[in-house]
């Protein structure tokens, strides 16, 4: 898991700090061999991860101390929970059946959640309308309209398995699961949902 506030996503980026770079540097130092990792996803700049999977190839036996060693070497914004052996044909990205994102919106001016939630307290949101719009997402196949402009995607086809808004006090949580996500896709969907919740758009405008 990691706090993505200071990272430009998981994947290595030229001249930018990434989670993958920090993880590979730690693994290579501890295992004394160059290690390359493959993550289950890339995650956008500033996105946090509660549970991110990655795989790497290593021919020797893994020490039980590796998790402790990694957490001692990595910056405090990255935490390794477990290291375990998998089958040779396992692939962190392509073996994943689905991915889940959670997006939080604070309905109050809360400085303590500023790094972890969109502060949207000046105008109320109609959660019912936003959930009505969620149902329309299941009708989509091509999510190109929600992708970052100029993104080099081989295909914009995604399959949504779950999409829902729920409110807990002054916090809204959007949960969405899909087989894959395009760059900036979740943020774009949330932005559109907020437009619907604030009355600037109607759920039917998604069709």
Model regions: which residues?
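Structured-RNA-binding interfaces characteristic of tRNA pseudouridine synthases
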Residues: 1-207
């Amino acid at each position: 898991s990691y706090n993505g506030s200071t990272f430009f996503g998981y994947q290595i980026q030229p001249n930018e700090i990434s989670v993958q770079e920090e993880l590979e540097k730690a693994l290579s130092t501890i295992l004394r061999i160059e290690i390359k990792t493959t993550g289950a996803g890339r995650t956008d700049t500033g996105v946090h991860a509660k549970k991110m999977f990655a795989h790497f190839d290593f021919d020797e036996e893994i020490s039980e101390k590796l998790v402790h060693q990694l957490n001692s070497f990595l910056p405090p914004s990255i935490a390794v929970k477990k290291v375990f052996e998998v089958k040779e044909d396992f692939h962190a990205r392509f073996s994943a059946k689905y991915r889940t994102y959670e997006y939080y919106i604070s309905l109050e001016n809360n400085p303590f959640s500023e790094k972890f939630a969109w502060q949207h307290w000046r105008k109320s949101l109609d959660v019912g309308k936003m959930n009505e719009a969620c149902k329309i997402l299941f009708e989509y196949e091509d999510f190109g309209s929600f992708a970052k402009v100029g993104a080099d995607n081989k295909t914009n086809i995604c399959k949504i398995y779950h999409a829902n808004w729920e409110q807990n006090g002054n916090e809204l949580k959007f949960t969405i699961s899909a087989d894959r996500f395009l760059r900036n896709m979740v943020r774009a969907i949330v932005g559109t949902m907020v437009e619907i919740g604030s009355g600037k758009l109607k759920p039917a405008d998604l069709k």
